[in-house]
Amino acid sequence: MATFLFKTVALLVLQSPQQDLWARVNADSTDGPAWLELGRAYLQRAADYHTHRKPVTVDTVWAHANLDTAQFAFERAARWSAGTRTADSARVYRVYAFGEWAYVDWEAAGSAAATLTWHSLPEGLRLPPVLEELGENLLRACPHRGILFTAGETDTQAAWYLRFSRGL
């Protein structure tokens, strides 16, 4: 299993359009902003999973590998840029990556799988208070058994985070 994961990650690195970001990270592994940009690039690649443009059945391994790489990059960005906007952004993107992971699992296996993914969120990983308040306001404004339409990904992720990981 470890060999398979290593080969998958190696394949992602070799085929990635983010080679310049990998070069920056290899030159200075403590470059927090480079890790953040790398994570954002992999998060975008994982979000492309939802387009389902391929005529064959889409495999979730590719999306999960991209999300794992994004999580790894965001963890590094937060670690090497402690106390900065880069670290704050990295923490928000880590929660966003969990939301994308839950979305992939929801498409593949239903709402129970998405809920389990949200429950695997580390306890110490939280959205900033302003985004938690946004999600709470959206959820409280929605009637019981109502349908919540959001204006964008920020609203959606904040609402999903509070609904599924915090149980609101």
Please give the residue ranges for each predicted region.
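A conserved position within tetratricopeptide repeats
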Residues: W22-N26, Q71-D88, P122, L139
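Acidic/histidine-rich, surface-exposed loop or edge segments in extracytoplasmic proteins
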Residues: T51-V56, L116-H119, A141
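Helix-turn-helix repeat elements of alpha-solenoid scaffolds
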Residues: V13-D20, W62-A82, A109-A112, L127
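Soluble catalytic regions of membrane-associated enzymes that act on cell-envelope
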Residues: H64-D68, F72-E75, E100, W118-G146, ...
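Hydrophobic alpha-helical targeting segments used for export or membrane insertion
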Residues: M1-Q15
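Amphipathic alpha-helical repeat scaffolds of TPR domains
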Residues: N26-V58, A65, F72-R76, A87-A112
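Boundary/linker segments of alpha-helical solenoid repeat arrays
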Residues: G32, S81-R94, P122-P129
